[in-house]
From Swiss-Prot:
Source domain of life: Bacteria
Protein's recorded name: Polysaccharide lyase
N-palmitoyl cysteine: lipidated positions: C23
GO cellular component entries: cell outer membrane; periplasmic space
Source organism of this protein record: Stenotrophomonas maltophilia (strain K279a)
Entry's family note: Belongs to the polysaccharide lyase 5 family.
Regulation: Is inhibited by mono- and divalent cations as well as L-ascorbic acid 6-hexadecanoate.
EC number of this enzyme: 4.2.2.-, 4.2.2.3, 4.2.2.1, 4.2.2.14
Membrane topology: Lipid-anchor
Catalytic activity annotation: Eliminative cleavage of alginate to give oligosaccharides with 4-deoxy-alpha-L-erythro-hex-4-enuronosyl groups at their non-reducing ends and beta-D-mannuronate at their reducing end; [hyaluronan](n) = n 3-(4-deoxy-beta-D-gluc-4-enuronosyl)-N-acetyl-D-glucosamine + H2O; Eliminative cleavage of (1->4)-beta-D-glucuronans to give oligosaccharides with 4-deoxy-beta-D-gluc-4-enuronosyl groups at their non-reducing ends. Complete degradation of glucuronans results in the formation of tetrasaccharides
PROSITE patterns registered for this protein in UniProt: PROKAR_LIPOPROTEIN
Described purpose of this protein according to its UniProt entry: Polysaccharide lyase that catalyzes the depolymerization of several anionic polysaccharides via a beta-elimination mechanism. Exhibits broad substrate specificity, catalyzing the degradation of not only alginate and poly-beta-D-mannuronate (poly-ManA), but poly-beta-D-glucuronate (poly-GlcA or poly-GlcUA) and hyaluronate (HA) as well. The oligosaccharide products formed by enzymatic cleavage are comprised mainly of disaccharides, with a lower abundance of trimers and pentamers. Is not active on poly-D-galacturonate, heparin and heparin sulfate.
UniProt note: pH dependence: Optimum pH for enzymatic activity is substrate-dependent, with optimal hyaluronate degradation at pH 5, poly-beta-D-glucuronate degradation at pH 7, and alginate degradation at pH 9.
Length: 331
């Protein structure tokens, strides 16, 4: 490299070095998770505020970590700053070394700890995917096995046939699919695809999901919530040149329209559940689906409420939908 070129690049190199030097130390990764269920009725529609706060406090370190790696990986996606990618990889590698979340899922009053691990895998696998092109072989050797162990631990939870494969199954599938994609693990990719397909197969002709219709006043909310990981999984499939949106004659479109119509007027949900629905503003899946829908204008009003952020879906969803989930093609 010539001296003039080196001098020209010096400010950029110094800025990146300074940013990486400023990367804060990650918190220690804990092996066990203790989360607390906070619904008081069988339908899962009535919240106990005290239990909800206890759960929020108990899981705050996990939520902060997820938000931090999402933010750092967003910085890389937005600016191509290698220091942001390296900080993300440093944090992921530290928790991999700690064996974070591979210990006991402590059952307090329900399976909330298992659900929390699923959401955390969603977050860390999506963050890793976003910075994958900056990971060197040594970093991949640290991080890949950890994510794969988490994914297989999450899948093992669903081996019990008594567990209801509702929105939690779809959210679990997202982390497994993202891990399969990021680590080039075909078995995990196929397992994630199976979770996606289960969600698509659950969609009725009227766009409803039977298990979410049983959620009383929160049925509309949980249709929106269940749709989010399905849309994100379809987006990950696009990175491999696959169109999962077309599955079962575009069944996902029926669900998306049912949710967006319900957010404007919940009368249909009120009638079919027998419960007045809590108000809903559609969540960040609209940032992607409005670009894929045959009638994207239906989702413009929801899009206008953005930008949308969700660490469990990867971070800044508006950024990811606009610029792509990854900067370079997957290896």
């Amino acid at each position: 490299m010539s001296l003039p070129l080196r001098l020209a690049l010096l400010p950029t190199l110094l800025a990146s070095a300074s940013a990486f030097a400023a990367c804060p130390a990650p918190p220690p990764g804990q092996p066990d998770i203790r989360a607390i269920g906070y619904y008081t009725d069988k339908a899962g529609s009535v919240i106990d505020p005290a239990l909800q706060q206890q759960n929020k406090d108990a899981t705050a370190p996990l939520d902060r970590y997820a938000a931090d790696v999402a933010r750092m990986s967003d910085d890389y996606l937005r600016n191509g700053d290698p220091a942001a990618a390296q900080c993300t990889l440093s944090w992921l590698g530290a928790w991999a070394d700690d064996g974070a979340m591979l210990g006991q899922m402590i059952r307090v009053n329900n399976d909330q700890s298992f659900y929390m691990r699923q959401w955390m895998l969603d977050a860390v696998a999506m963050a890793y995917l976003k910075v994958h092109d900056q990971a060197n072989p040594q970093q991949r050797a640290r991080i890949d096995p950890w994510l794969q162990k988490l994914a297989r631990a999450n899948l093992a939870y669903w081996d019990n046939p008594k567990r209801r494969r509702n929105n939690h199954y779809y959210w679990g599938g997202l982390g497994v699919l993202a891990t399969g994609l990021a680590t080039d693990d075909d078995a995990l990719w196929q397992a994630g695809h199976a979770a996606f397909q289960k969600g698509i197969d659950d969609i009725q002709d009227d766009g409803s999901l039977p298990l979410e219709m049983a959620r009383g006043q929160r049925a509309l909310h949980y249709h929106d919530y269940a749709l989010a990981p399905l849309v994100m999984m379809a987006e990950l499939a696009r990175l491999r040149g696959q169109d999962w949106y077309a599955s079962r004659n575009h069944a996902i479109d029926r669900l998306a329209r049912r949710v967006i119509e319900g957010s404007r007027d919940p009368a249909w949900f009120n009638q079919h559940t027998g419960a007045a629905q809590l108000p809903l503003q559609a969540s960040g899946w609209v940032e992607f689906y409005r670009l894929r829908s045959p009638d994207g204008g239906v989702f413009d009003a929801a899009h206008a409420r953005g930008p949308f952020h969700s660490p469990r879906l990867g971070g800044d969803l508006t950024l990811m939908a606009t610029h792509g989930i990854v900067r370079t093609p997957l290896r």
